Every structure is written in structure tokens, then in C-alpha cells.
């Protein structure tokens, strides 16, 4: 399987589920944005060889892509340690060891999927910020480590009054590096971030990173 597409889809499963029903092995990605699922999730699944894939509206304003694949199910459960979903509270999912052990380029694809699923762009009285939410802190600490490798400094990781952990990026320099190296493929989030940043993103030569330029082997977000 294509590693880039697979790692992205694993990250995007932060808003998804993996479960078995009778003899069927299901993997589902959710979003309130149909266009995102069609243009990004479906296209990456097709790269992995899943061609008979469609987006369904399962309730008002909510969409999903669901595939039945024993092979992908076992990859996600056995290699990426995804917990099996139940009807009860969602089980916390620490960062998979395979992701931790992977090369930086694949870790970045995982982060891209993660932020598309759980990231948000916020304009407040304090300025622009990107927040990434999660049930437990550990996955956000790993995200912070990867972001640091491309020169994105995280403002902090906070526990909200709602019991949800949030990673925050708030400095303009880090927001611009985030947009350049990670970014959003989710159309609404991408549009909002670029509009709030207010000017074209600089090229890699203008972004001081590891070694004074772009981190080795890391391409701009796509």
C-alpha cells in the first residue's frame, strides 16, 4: 500500500471508527464537509486500490465514507493499534508505534490527516490560532514533536473546561510555517486560515527551518 496515502488516512481516522459487524470489517471516516470526503478521503482510498467508494449523508449535515475491507481493518487494528469502536464512549487512541517509528515524511502525512479531522481555525480578540482537539494528551504531544521538526512552535497544550485537550498554534511565524508545511486539505479550514493570514505564503527559502531553510526531505503542504 502507498505509505503516504495510508498514513494520511490513519491520521484522518481521528474522526472515524473501525469496527466489525458479523462477517463485515468496516472502516469509516466522518466529516460535516462532503467535498472534503470526496476530494481527499475518497481519492486517497482509490490510491490504495479501493475504487468502489462513495460519500453518504447519514444524518442532516453529516457525511461519511465507509468501506468494508478485512485487509485494511487488520492493518489498522494490528499495525496502527486502532481500538475497535463500540456504542459506548470512544476509546482513547494513543499515537501508534508504527507512526512514531516512521520517517518524518510519513509522520507529516499522518499529522496532515489528523489536523484535517480534528483541527480548527479560530479568530479571537487575541488574534488567529489553530487548535487541534483530542480526548487524551499524548497524541497532541506527538503532534507537537513533529511540528517542531518543521519549525512550527506550539503555544501550548491545554485541558479545556469541557474535558478536551487542545494543542494551540498562535504565533504568526508558526502559523505561516504550519500553513506552508502542514496546512489543511479541508476546503473550509484551508480557506479560513489563508484569508486570516492575509497574504501569500513565502517560499521555502524565506522560511528559516532546520539548517536555515526547508527541513531536509520535507515538501510544502499539498
Curated annotation (Swiss-Prot):
Domain of life: Archaea
Gene Ontology BP annotations: intron homing
Cofactor(s) it depends on: Mg(2+); Mn(2+)
Temperature dependence, free-text field: Optimum temperature is 90 degrees Celsius. Active from 70 to 90 degrees Celsius.
pH dependence text: Optimum pH is 7.5.
Enzymatic class: hydrolase
GO molecular function: endonuclease activity
Cofactor note: 1-5 mM manganese gives higher cleavage activity than the same concentration of magnesium.
Its EC number(s): 3.1.-.-
UniProt KW keywords: Endonuclease, Hydrolase, Intron homing, Nuclease
Database matches in InterPro entries: Homing_endonucl, LAGLIDADG_dom
Subunit comment: Probably functions as a monomer.
Protein task: Endonuclease involved in 16S rRNA intron I-alpha homing. Recognizes the minimal target 5'-GCAAGGCTGAAACTTAAAGG-3'; generates 4 base 3' protruding ends 5'-AAAC-3' and 5'-GTTT-3'.
Name by which UniProt lists this protein: Homing endonuclease I-ApeI
Organism expressing this protein natively: Aeropyrum pernix (strain ATCC 700893 / DSM 11879 / JCM 9820 / NBRC 100138 / K1)
Amino acid at each position: 500500500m502507498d505509505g503516504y496515502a495510508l498514513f494520511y488516512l490513519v491520521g484522518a481516522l481521528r474522526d472515524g471508527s473501525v469496527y466489525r459487524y458479523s462477517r463485515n470489517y468496516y472502516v469509516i471516516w466522518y466529516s460535516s464537509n462532503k467535498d472534503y470526503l470526496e476530494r481527499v478521503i475518497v481519492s486517497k482510498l482509490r490510491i490504495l486500490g479501493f475504487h468502489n467508494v462513495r460519500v453518504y449523508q447519514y444524518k442532516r449535515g453529516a457525511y461519511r465514507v465507509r468501506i468494508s475491507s478485512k485487509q485494511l481493518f487488520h492493518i489498522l487494528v494490528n499495525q496502527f493499534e486502532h481500538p475497535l469502536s463500540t456504542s459506548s464512549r470512544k476509546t482513547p487512541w494513543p499515537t501508534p508505534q508504527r507512526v512514531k517509528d516512521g520517517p518524518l515524511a510519513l509522520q507529516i502525512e499522518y499529522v496532515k490527516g489528523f489536523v484535517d479531522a480534528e483541527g480548527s481555525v479560530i479568530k479571537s480578540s487575541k488574534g488567529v490560532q489553530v487548535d487541534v482537539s483530542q480526548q487524551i494528551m499524548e497524541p497532541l504531544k506527538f503532534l507537537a514533536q513533529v511540528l517542531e521538526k518543521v519549525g512550527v512552535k506550539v503555544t501550548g497544550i491545554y485541558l479545556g473546561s469541557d474535558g478536551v485537550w487542545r494543542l494551540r498554534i498562535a504565533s504568526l511565524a508558526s502559523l505561516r510555517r504550519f500553513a506552508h508545511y502542514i496546512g489543511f486539505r479541508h476546503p473550509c479550514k484551508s480557506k479560513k486560515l489563508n484569508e486570516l493570514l492575509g497574504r501569500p505564503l513565502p517560499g521555502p527559502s524565506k522560511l528559516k527551518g532546520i539548517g536555515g531553510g526547508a527541513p531536509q526531505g520535507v515538501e510544502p503542504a499539498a
